[in-house]
């Protein structure tokens, strides 16, 4: 998955994730996720989005995975992962946006574990904090985003895991 420039493109909606996300096909008939405020509002399959603007983020999908995204990932987790990626880009510049789906999945499972009182430890948290200090600081921002958006607070161990996602996107 990679990020594309979206300002001057045309997209056909395949399906709506929520008010802030759609799965669409670009001009080359490739599946993408478009995320940004209001991009999915009152959209339905077949709608055309012309020149969505610079505030919309576009992520390329592997061939024929758009339907899986529509069925498998709660859009709130995509939005949260997108917000974390945008924050990481402010700190580091360009990063590999293929972490969107794995990061969204990780956050979803983290919240599921919290809801079910399951604790998972990360024996490498101290090492991650030292070796990847900048990534860890960005991941601490993820804690605030998750708390604000979902009302749950992730542990330091989860911050360590999110740091690894961010580090992978920089490598």
Regions found by a protein language model. Give the residues of each.
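A cross-family "folded-core" feature that marks the main globular domain of proteins
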Residues: 2-171
